[in-house]
A protein has these predicted regions:
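Serine-hydrolase catalytic machinery in alpha/beta-hydrolase-like enzymes
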Residues: 19-109, 192-198
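Active-site nucleophile loop of the alpha/beta-hydrolase fold
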Residues: 76-77, 136-144, 167
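Catalytic active-site module of serine/aspartate enzymes centered on a nucleophile-bearing elbow/loop
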Residues: 96, 199-224
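Gly/Ala-rich beta-loop-alpha elbow adjacent to hydrolase catalytic centers
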Residues: 114-122
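Hydrolases whose catalytic domains are alpha/beta-hydrolase-1, hotdog thioesterase
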Residues: 121-125, 145
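Short beta-strand/loop motif that positions the catalytic acidic residue
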Residues: 158-159, 164-166, 170, 188
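Conserved alpha/beta-hydrolase "acid-adjacent" motif
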Residues: 171-177
């Protein structure tokens, strides 16, 4: 159970509740979108260049609760503190460890997830924290233009069922660049690192987002 002294609850609206959790990296913030009859918690964090308002995280928070999945959008301490730059990976991992008791408090299996840098954190810490599975959105396989600096080992080492959702034109790693491994991969056609698609594409932005939510809904439904 999370220490009551470490957590503050503030209800923002009927559909969302915000929770401040003290971690060894500083205060983190969880925005809960709770399912009425939840069977899973999906915790998702942001990347190094944006927040939980990202289109994929917002869409999942809107779509999944109706299907029995509570969504927890997590803001790392550096974002809560208003800093411009993300800290080192070990500090991101420290913040994620610190919020885990609050995520596990409902007593449900927790799927650890995130986009970009948040996906790396989820992969690195999944086994240690006892995550039920990992959702990796826009996994940054390598820095743009530097495929030799691969982060595949983090993905391959998650140790739990893992779904990667990747834009077809992601400069941090296109779907065809990913190595074979014990994970599932769904491509968002023409999507960039933020899953934005060009206007000339044969898929609309709304359809691209639907690829993400449909894939995650099907995958979470398959988890035992």
């Amino acid at each position: 159970m999370t220490d009551a002294n470490d957590v503050a609850h503030v209800t923002n609206a009927a559909e969302a509740t915000t929770e401040i959790v003290e971690t060894d990296a500083g205060p983190a913030r969880i925005t809960w979108h709770t399912a009425e009859k939840a069977r899973l918690v999906l915790a998702v964090s942001h990347g190094a260049g944006g927040g939980i308002e990202a289109r994929d995280l917002t869409a999942l928070a809107a779509a999944l609760p109706a299907h029995g999945v509570s969504v927890a959008r997590v803001e790392q301490p550096w974002r809560v503190a208003g800093k411009k730059l993300a800290p080192a990976p070990k500090t991101l991992d420290l913040g994620w460890r610190g919020i885990w008791p609050a995520l596990a408090e409902p007593g449900l299996p927790v799927v650890s997830g995130g986009r970009s840098a948040g996906a790396r954190v989820a992969c690195r810490t999944a086994t240690e924290l006892g995550a039920h599975a990992v959702l990796a959105l826009s996994f940054p396989l390598h820095p743009p233009g530097k495929p030799e600096k691969s982060r595949a080992a983090e993905l391959l080492g998650s140790g739990v069922p893992t779904l990667v959702v990747q834009g077809g034109n992601d400069p941090f790693g296109k779907p065809g660049e990913f190595p074979e491994g014990p994970y599932e991969l769904v491509e968002v056609p023409h999507g960039d690192h933020g899953f934005a698609v060009p206007k000339r594409a044969e898929i609309t932005q709304e359809e691209a987002v639907a690829v993400i939510t449909d894939a995650v809904l099907e995958w979470t439904g398959s988890l035992g």
